[in-house]
Curated annotation (Swiss-Prot):
The chain crosses the membrane at residues 141-161, 188-208, 225-245, 280-300, 311-331, 338-358, 361-381, 391-410, 415-432, 436-456, 481-501, 551-571. It is found in: Endosome membrane. It comes from the Eukaryota. PANTHER family: GLUTATHIONE EXCHANGER 1-RELATED, MAJOR FACILITATOR SUPERFAMILY. CDD domains: MFS_ARN_like. GO terms for cellular component: cell periphery; cellular bud membrane; endosome; endosome membrane; fungal-type vacuole; plasma membrane; vacuolar membrane. Residues 162-187, 246-279, 332-337, 382-390, 433-435, 502-550 are lumenal. GO terms for biological process: ferric-enterobactin import into cell; intracellular iron ion homeostasis; transmembrane transport. Residues 1-140, 209-224, 301-310, 359-360, 411-414, 457-480, 572-606 are cytoplasmic. Keywords: Endosome, Ion transport, Iron, Iron transport, Membrane, Transmembrane, Transmembrane helix, Transport. Its main location: membrane. The gene is ENB1. It comes from Saccharomyces cerevisiae (strain ATCC 204508 / S288c) (Baker's yeast). One of its GO terms (molecular function) is ferric-enterobactin transmembrane transporter activity. This is Siderophore iron transporter ENB1.
């Protein structure tokens, strides 16, 4: 299934289209780094080494081994990520810093937002696996610091360093599968690294309960420590088939040398060119913008008084100014902007970026306090609430597998994106209906299943459309942009949900239960669940309060889901083929064919 047509290498120099002039094509060739040329050479070996047939589909043996290793790596790093996310609460609590968990999550989101594009650019220059090893070093150092630190500041630093490595794994896995797969199989291939979510969703909770808790307060250190061993071993399994393919390519004389600098360049010139290649100034401006805008949202936490404090206002104002400077830099001065200028006129990329942001934002608003709502308003246990809250990730991954297989035989990704976007609105509507215990937990579970299926139909098929709109040279960079926007949507959604929750819930509880009890329940709702079981008068008032706030959250989520459904109609409905990427001529032919279709076919994408 994961068969790539290597004729794309000849198509990169195509100069026959109107839109992509001879100058543009020469720029593409010029910008093809030694890392990308090495990637192409290794991919050819991976595809041509040997093959076998199963289920009527031809598979490359070495490529299949690499993808199986990628699956194992995804299982180990995914499990480590889920466990780290859970035990950081226990770790912070052991240092008496439980209230700082929100700040940790915000900084992690910012890190994940800003490192994706630099990782993509560096991997284009030096190679995917070479960059993967660099990410592994950061990940392992972060895990070691987190496991051994005697202070909370050390824990914070370790978690942030670990996030630098983990975010690299996510980007590089997607870029690697993009290198190895044709567009028709891209949706399925991109999900290989995330398929283990299907398993980890159900086992991570049991592992967390065994390495964290009150019985052994510092046992959480093992939750970090064991992955200092597991992840490097799984990485070795991933590296071996790729390095073997590199060796075969080198032995045949087809592996280009890795150029760290051009002939005649000084060290200073080399470093300056490297800074230009990864758009270092843009990265710094983008990072500062996110920190100064998103961090105040977390610090203020929706409390009106804090929004009026000088340092909050100053951070937001300065952040907004830096955001404006960042836009000017990207449009006027950056030699290698985040969005390559050759694609500035392509609506598919902008619509996809906006959809990625809007869908994740609306989804995070719904998910942010779902565990608390399940325990307070539905009477679910901690383990049950955690598993229900993970249904989205589970169903999204399952749906990605099915959609990925279907796209191999029906190569029209936009159809699935449109269907998923409309289904997402229906799912959010069901969540609005089934939001308290009186409506039944089965209804809420059903609604979460619908939303999860919708997410699986939207994300990777939409990414496939974006990949069809770009060349291989820019594929990793555009993927990094999509990942960055995803994380920004996640952070903004959490901030909006926190603002609504903080400003409205306390007032509701105080109005219904009085100042003393209302504030006590607001601060620690889980401490009162056994004292006031479902059916008691106090619990009834708690359920009514939480139901009212959940209603507001779902209304906001529905609004964003509806906006996402409108946006999906503006994507270009490319028909994808077995090539790694479309040539400029093929893209222009596809655009012309789409223009000649009826308006209904253009909107739906079939």
């Amino acid at each position: 299934m994961l068969e790539t047509d290597h004729s794309r290498n000849d198509n990169l120099d195509d100069k026959s289209t109107v839109c992509y002039s001879e100058k543009t094509d020469s720029n593409v060739e010029k910008s093809t780094t030694s890392g990308l040329r090495r990637i192409d050479a290794v991919n050819k070996v991976l595809s041509d080494y040997s093959s076998f047939t199963a289920f009527g589909v031809t598979f490359s043996s070495l490529k299949t081994a690499l993808l199986v290793a990628l699956f194992l790596q995804g299982y180990c790093t995914g499990l480590g990520g889920q466990i780290s996310q859970s035990i950081q609460t226990y770790a912070a609590n052991s240092f008496g810093k439980h209230s700082q968990v929100g700040s940790i999550n915000t900084v992690k989101s910012i890190v994940a937002s800003v490192v994706a594009v630099p990782y993509a650019r560096i991997s284009d220059r030096f190679g995917r696996i070479e960059c993967w090893i660099f990410a592994l070093v950061l990940y392992t150092i972060g895990e070691i610091i987190s496991a051994a630190t005697p202070t909370f500041s050390g824990l914070f630093a370790g978690i942030v360093i670990q996030q630098f490595g983990y975010s690299g794994f996510r980007l590089l896995a997607t870029a690697l599968t993009g290198d190895l797969s044709g567009l028709r199989d891209r949706t399925f291939a991109m999900n290989i690294f995330l398929i283990p979510v299907i398993i980890n969703t159900w086992v991570s909770g049991n592992i967390v309960s065994s390495v964290a808790g009150n019985v052994a307060p510092y046992k959480w250190r093992w939750g970090y420590g064991i992955f200092c061993i597991i992840v490097p071993i799984s990485t070795l399994i991933l590296v071996l088939p790729y390095v073997y393919a590199q060796y075969i390519s080198w032995r045949s004389g087809k592996l280009p040398p890795l150029k760290l600098k051009e002939k005649g360049q000084t060290l200073r010139q080399t470093l300056w060119k490297f800074a230009d290649d990864i758009n270092l100034i843009g990265v710094i401006l983008f990072t500062a913008f996110l920190v100064l805008v998103l961090l105040p949202l977390t610090i203020a936490g929706g409390a009106t008084s804090k929004w009026r404090e000088g340092h909050i206002i100053a951070m937001i104002v300065v952040g907004g100014c830096l955001g404006f400077i960042f836009l000017i830099w990207e449009l006027k001065f950056a030699k290698n902007p985040f969005i390559p200028r050759v694609y500035l006129g392509d609506p598919t990329i902008y619509v996809a970026l906006l959809m990625e942001f809007v869908w994740r934002l609306g989804l995070q608003i719904e998910l942010e306090y779902l565990v608390t709502v399940l325990m307070v308003a539905f009477g679910e246990s901690t383990l049950s609430a955690q598993r229900i809250a993970q249904l989205y990730n589970f169903l999204q991954s399952c749906t990605n597998i099915v959609v990925g297989i279907m796209l191999h035989f029906y190569p029209h990704p936009k159809v699935f994106v449109v269907a998923g976007s409309l289904l997402g609105v229906i799912g959010m509507g069901l969540l609005y209906k089934y939001r308290v215990v009186y409506d039944g937990i089965s209804g809420l579970i059903g609604a979460e299943i619908v939303v999860g299926i919708a997410g699986g139909m939207i994300r990777f098929p939409m990414w496939t459309l974006v990949h069809a709109s770009t060349t291989h040279n820019e594929m990793a960079t555009v993927t990094g942009l999509l990942m960055s926007v995803y994380q920004i949507g996640d952070a903004v959604g959490a901030s909006i949900a926190g603002a609504i929750w903080t400003q409205r819930l306390a007032k509701e509880l105080i109005q219904r239960l009085g100042s003393s009890l209302g504030m006590a329940i607001y601060k620690s709702p889980l401490n009162y669940l056994k004292k006031y079981p479902i059916g008691s008068e106090v619990r009834v008032q708690m359920i009514e309060s939480y139901s009212k706030i959940q209603r507001l959250l779902i209304i906001v989520s529905i609004s964003f889901a509806a906006f996402n459904a409108v946006l999906c109609f503006f994507l270009r409905g490319f028909t994808v083929n077995k090539k790694q990427s479309l040539s400029a001529e093929e893209r222009e032919k596809e655009k012309l064919k789409i223009k000649q279709q009826s308006w209904l076919r253009r909107v739906i994408g079939y």
